[in-house]
């Protein structure tokens, strides 16, 4: 199975980590990377305080995301990274570092997003930033390498749907 480097994207609470980890269990020689772990401490503190990040805040983080993908690919692994990648310009920045990146936008109903964020424990992204993220989100354009997948059903079904859509798109 030939799978490109994947960016599982969307707003907080859409299931990026769950889907990404599920994909890694199905894709040989793959590695899961949580882009949240690549944020500088100052970004984490801003978000924890309920302050939305600016594009300037995100720039070094997006570069680190692209480098992490490129490094994994160079090591012979298929990176599967959970990363919001909300704007086209952010995705282009990732593509500049990893030109083979393929984006999977997880599309989740707003009420479900709110429920998920309220139930989360030990995550620095407060539910109060959901509106900011939804306002920032730019859906994938037809010329971008990626697919949008509606998130319905149990997590395992979503993983299978995502994998099928990625393989069909290639």
Regions found by a protein language model. Name each.
Residues 5:
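Walker A (P-loop) ATP-phosphate-binding motif of ABC ATPase nucleotide-binding domains
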């Amino acid at each position: 199975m030939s799978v490109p480097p994947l960016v599982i994207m969307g707003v907080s609470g859409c299931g990026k980590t769950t889907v990404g980890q599920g994909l890694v269990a199905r894709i040989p020689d793959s590695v899961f990377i949580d882009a949240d772990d690549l944020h500088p401490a100052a970004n984490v503190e801003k978000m924890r305080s309920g302050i939305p990040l600016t594009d300037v805040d995100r720039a070094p983080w997006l570069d680190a995301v692209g480098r992490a993908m490129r490094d994994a690919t160079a090591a012979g692994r298929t990176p599967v990274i959970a990363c919001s990648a909300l704007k086209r310009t952010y995705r282009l920045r990732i593509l500049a570092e990893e030109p083979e990146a393929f984006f999977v936008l997880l599309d989740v109903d707003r009420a479900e997003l709110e429920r998920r964020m309220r139930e989360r424990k030990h995550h620095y992204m407060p539910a109060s930033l959901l509106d900011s993220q939804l306002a920032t989100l730019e859906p994938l354009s037809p010329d971008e390498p990626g697919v949008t997948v509606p998130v319905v059903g149990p997590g395992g079904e979503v993983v299978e749907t995502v994998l099928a859509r990625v393989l069909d798109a290639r």
